[in-house]
Design a protein with these regions (language model features):
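N-terminal accessory targeting/assembly segments
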Residues: 1-88, 93, 97
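Residues that form or immediately flank small-molecule/cofactor binding pockets and catalytic motifs
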Residues: 13, 49, 94, 116, ...
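Active-site phosphate-binding and catalytic loops of NTP-dependent enzymes
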Residues: 38-42, 77-81, 95-102, 119-125, ...
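P-loop NTPase catalytic core
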Residues: 137-464
């Protein structure tokens, strides 16, 4: 039911208060019509009897307590969706800002989405190729998964996001699209994202939503919801496999904290609202696959850990909800290694069911386990070398140290190279081939005969040239 109200009871910052209104719903969309003919959009953030509080996205400057006309639309924030969204740049509310004209919608969807019946969910299988060895081999991204990237301020997570957008694909060649939402970014970062996508030719399969640092915080809270609404339309209406990249979730959570404080809510840990967990879950749980649909929604939320603290509420709660994490290492980043993925704390909890024979290659699981095991031993050898010096290490530990350096420089630090899964797995075996066969205790004899020995032969042949 549409309601109209003349005048405002109070104006407080970005909040306006209406008295004497009935039938208003929480989260309802409001339109405020000013004397000069302009219209501002707001959202009902509190209802108390016949009083409601509206947060105005564009701010309250110029509003009048007497003559302002407020229209309560009777529905929540909606998003216009259409196949024409692909290749377009939108603001945080889903409105075009690329100068290419309006989008003619084929449907309007609630940005809050609809809850997915757990019974109708399909268990995620099949992987999404990123072209990044440390992810594809050791923390494989599975369709329908939510796999966050834990980064730190000043690290190269923006470059990594661009590389994933440029290289991401699905192995079976089915329709693939990317929804990229940037929240609270500076103008130069927004320009970097846009120019990077356009220069590499990826823009035609990308829907881009930009919420800048000087945009309203309430818009920042809507942005990931608008992005996921677009993704759900592309996936479940158009049967596309959709990858959603949300950066930076820390900006989103800080906007939520500021918004909660403005409403006078009791703060929780580090000032964040007590409902931070359920709010993040309402976003992350929109990933998945539904029975009867050929599409999927996969999420990569990117967040910068305040003070590089993985126990901070934002990464801590994100880790509870999602299915693994990719952790970027500041020490690696300082040495110029890119991408600076710290493989030992990184994991993908769903990769075991989406790799191996029929998905990637039969040796993938074994190779991944062996690389993890050997690199963990490298850390032990490094710790010992820091005490007694590398020259005093045993021969086996020296071999491990050499393997560790090669693994970091060649396997992890691949730069902007796009590697196929085959190239990644072959490189993994070539690195393991620098170690003696009896050191590979996670591999069976048949796998070693098929992959380790040919890799060792290739290395010997290359060294003899």
């Amino acid at each position: 039911m549409i309601l109209e109200h003349i005048g405002l009871s109070q104006i407080n910052g970005r909040l306006v208060v209406l008295d004497g209104v009935k039938g208003v719903q929480y989260d309802e969309r409001a339109e405020l019509h000013l004397d000069d003919g302009s219209t501002r959009v707001g959202r009902v953030v509190r209802v108390d009897g016949d009083r409601c509080v509206i947060q105005v996205f564009e701010g309250t400057r110029g509003l009048s307590l007497v003559n302002n006309r407020t229209v309560l639309t009777g529905h929540p924030m909606m998003m216009d969706v259409s196949p024409e969204l692909l290749g377009r740049v939108l603001d945080g509310l889903g409105r075009p800002i690329d100068g290419l004209g309006d989008i003619y919608p084929v449907a309007r969807r609630d940005v809050n989405g609809a809850p997915i019946n757990p019974v109708s969910r399909v268990y995620p299988r099949n992987y999404i190729h990123t072209g990044i060895s440390s992810i594809d081999c050791l923390a494989t991204l599975i369709r329908g998964q939510k796999l966050p990237i834990f980064s730190g301020s000043g690290m190269k997570h923006n470059e990594l996001a661009v590389q994933i957008v440029r290289q991401a694909s699905v192995a079976d060649g089915s329709d693939f699209a990317i929804v990229f939402a940037a929240m609270g970014v500076k103008n130069d970062v927004a320009s970097y994202f846009r120019e990077s996508f356009e220069s590499c030719g990826a823009m035609e399969r990308v829907v881009m939503l930009l919420n800048l640092a000087n945009d309203p915080i309430i818009e920042r809270i809507i942005t990931p919801r608008a992005a996921l609404t677009v993704a759900e339309y592309l996936a479940f209406d158009l049967n596309k496999n959709v990858l959603v990249i949300l950066t930076d979730m820390t900006s989103y959570c800080e906007a939520l904290r500021e918004f909660s404080s403005s409403k006078g809510e009791i703060p929780g840990r580090k000032g964040f609202p007590g409902y931070l967990y359920s709010d993040l879950a309402s976003l992350y749980e929109r990933a998945g696959i539904i029975k009867g649909s050929k599409g999927s929604v996969t999420q990569i939320p990117i967040l910068t850990m305040p003070g590089d603290d993985i126990t901070h509420p934002i990464p801590d709660l994100t880790g509870y909800i999602t299915e693994g994490q990719i952790v970027l290492d500041r020490g690696m980043d300082a040495t110029g290694l890119y991408p600076p993925v710290s493989v030992l704390p990184s994991l993908s909890r769903l990769m075991k069911d989406g790799i191996g024979a029929g998905y990637t290659r039969e040796d993938h699981v074994t190779l991944s386990n062996q690389l993890f095991a050997c690199y963990a031993k490298v850390q032990d050898a490094k710790a010992l070398a820091s005490v007694i010096g590398e020259e005093e290490l045993s021969q086996s530990d020296k071999q491990l140290m050499a393997f560790g350096r090669a693994f970091e420089q060649e396997f992890i630090g691949q730069g902007n190279t796009d590697r196929t899964m085959e190239q990644t797995l072959d490189l993994g075996w070539e690195l393991l081939a620098t170690l003696p066969r009896n050191a590979l205790d996670r591999c069976d004899a048949a796998t070693l005969d098929k992959y380790y020995e040919p890799a060792k032969a290739r290395i010997s042949k290359a060294n003899n040239k």
